Curated annotation (Swiss-Prot):
Involved in protein export. Acts as a chaperone by maintaining the newly synthesized protein in an open conformation. Functions as a peptidyl-prolyl cis-trans isomerase. Gene3D superfamilies: 3.10.50.40, Trigger factor ribosome-binding domain, Trigger factor, C-terminal domain. Belongs to the FKBP-type PPIase family. Tig subfamily. One of its GO terms (cellular component) is cytoplasm. Consists of 3 domains; the N-terminus binds the ribosome, the middle domain has PPIase activity, while the C-terminus has intrinsic chaperone activity on its own. Keywords: Cell cycle, Cell division, Chaperone, Cytoplasm, Isomerase, Rotamase. It catalyses: [protein]-peptidylproline (omega=180) = [protein]-peptidylproline (omega=0). The lineage of its organism: Bacteria, Pseudomonadati, Pseudomonadota, Gammaproteobacteria, Enterobacterales. It comes from the Bacteria. This is Trigger factor. It is found in: Cytoplasm. GO terms for molecular function: peptidyl-prolyl cis-trans isomerase activity. GO terms for biological process: cell division; protein folding; protein transport. Its main location: cytoplasm. It comes from Buchnera aphidicola subsp. Schizaphis graminum (strain Sg).
């Protein structure tokens, strides 16, 4: 068997394979003999029909089946020999073979996993946040929490500002046609302190109660509402109510004092531990995100189209399921995301992680997997039941194994990169806008 490979920069390669005619002829004859054994044709005893007649009657079907089998057989022999890892299904193309005396020629187009080397890890510089938590910081945090729990809102007759609580009705139109199923009444939220599209927040500012406002947006083609995907939709909003938060210093002071006194006697240490755990998680994610973002920049990869399609479909199905289960609002910002771009980033990270695991022979530590499961179980009322579920369910355990592997990869990278420590206060870390730091390592 002879083959010729044509390389393509975009992960789609083409191989041309020559199968000796003798192999094809022998396979055809063998197939015709098998058919003859099982077939009875008028005028001939079973198994005694001349091969030429069998060939005339069943030839086209047999040629098609035999060529298909041989094309697949020799292609998979080729990728096994060359140690090629393909993505998706290959596409076979037959050549005109009239002039070929010795070979039948065909080509196969196939996608391959991208080949790349992880570069410049030691040149990566990242910032590690260090927070020294003092008792007075914890008390301050408790005071803030106490005041949040007793927010009092009062109706106002003025222009809407950031952080006001508004109540609205809205309906939507496509080409001046009202889409009644999306009507929403008495929809309440705090301006600029929500997860809705910026157009909504921006339009409300400086408007008054009873104002009617309009804005138009183009819905993302990946939005869970199929009826709205890729369409220009006009929103009509009626402002029903505007409220501002009451700042009563005396009331807040009393509430804080009561809260702190109670907490100091009951579970002050628990609250402190929770704050420490939260900060540990925030700073760790911040560190990981910096490393991953720089790895992506320093190691560009051509993402194969098949992988991108599969990952985009996975994210789309996940979004649709979540949207329906939670009965989410069409204005939620996360559903106006370009899933293809998100899928590309996720695949980029996944390929880098897999490469680091392979190159450095990182393997699962079963003891650490068990410890992770135990840690997860402690968040539930019946930890032992949760541990048993993970023991019995191989898919769940595999998920934890992947998390443990990713943690090892991050530890490996943290040792390689240059870390610059930076001290933050508890206030700084609590007031930082962490929403802008997308969790990439997931």
């Amino acid at each position: 068997m002879k083959f010729f490979i044509e390389k393509n920069k975009k992960n789609t390669d083409r191989v041309t394979i020559n199968i000796p005619k003798k192999i094809v002829s022998n396979e055809l004859i063998r197939e015709f003999i098998e058919i003859n054994k099982k077939t009875k044709i008028n005028g001939f005893r079973k198994g005694k029909t001349p091969i030429k007649i069998i060939q005339e009657k069943y030839g086209n079907r047999v040629y098609y089946d035999v060529f298909n089998q041989l094309m697949q057989k020799f292609f998979y022999e080729f990728i096994k020999k060359e140690k090629i890892k393909i993505i998706g299904l290959p596409k076979y193309v037959m050549h005109e073979n009239e002039d070929q005396k010795e070979y039948f020629k065909y080509s196969v187009n196939y996608e391959v996993y991208p080949k790349f080397e992880i570069k410049d890890v030691n040149l990566i510089k990242v910032e590690k946040i260090i927070v020294n938590i003092k008792d007075e910081d914890v008390k301050k945090n408790i005071e803030k929490t106490a005041s949040y729990e007793k927010d009092i809102w009062n109706k106002v007759n003025r222009a809407i500002k950031t952080n006001d609580l508004v109540t609205i009705n809205y309906c939507i139109y496509e080409n001046n046609k009202k889409l009644d199923k999306f009507n929403v009444e008495k929809f309440k939220f705090i301006v600029s302190q929500n997860n809705f599209i910026p157009e909504l927040n921006n339009k409300l500012i400086n408007h008054f109660t009873n104002d009617v406002i309009f804005f138009k947006i183009n819905f993302c083609k990946f939005h869970p509402e199929e009826e709205l995907q890729g369409k220009d939709i006009t929103f009509k909003i009626k402002i029903l109510n505007v409220e501002e938060k009451q700042e009563n210093i005396e009331i807040e002071k009393n509430i804080k004092t009561i809260k702190i006194n109670k907490l100091s006697k009951l579970n002050y240490q628990t609250i402190k531990n929770n704050i420490i755990e939260k900060i540990k998680s925030l700073t760790q994610n911040h560190l990981q995100n910096q490393i991953i973002k720089q790895l992506i920049i320093k190691n560009p990869i051509n993402i194969p189209p098949t992988l991108l399609r599969e990952e985009t479909n996975f994210l789309r199905n996940k979004f649709i399921k979540e949207y329906k289960e939670k009965q989410e609002n069409i204005l939620k910002k996360k559903y106006h995301t370009n899933l293809e771009s998100k899928a590309k980033t996720r695949l980029h990270i996944k390929l880098i992680i897999e490469k680091i695991i392979r190159d450095n022979k990182i393997s699962v530590n079963e003891e650490k997997v068990d410890l992770l499961i135990k840690k997860i179980s402690l968040k539930y009322k019946k930890p032992l039941e949760i541990i048993n579920i993970y023991k019995k369910n191989t898919m769940l355990r595999k998920t934890i194994k992947n998390i443990e592997l990713e943690m090892q990869v991050m530890q490996f990278l943290i040792k390689k990169v240059k870390i610059i420590e930076k001290n933050w206060t508890l206030d700084e870390i609590m007031n930082y806008n962490w929403k802008n730091n997308e969790e990439l390592f997931a």
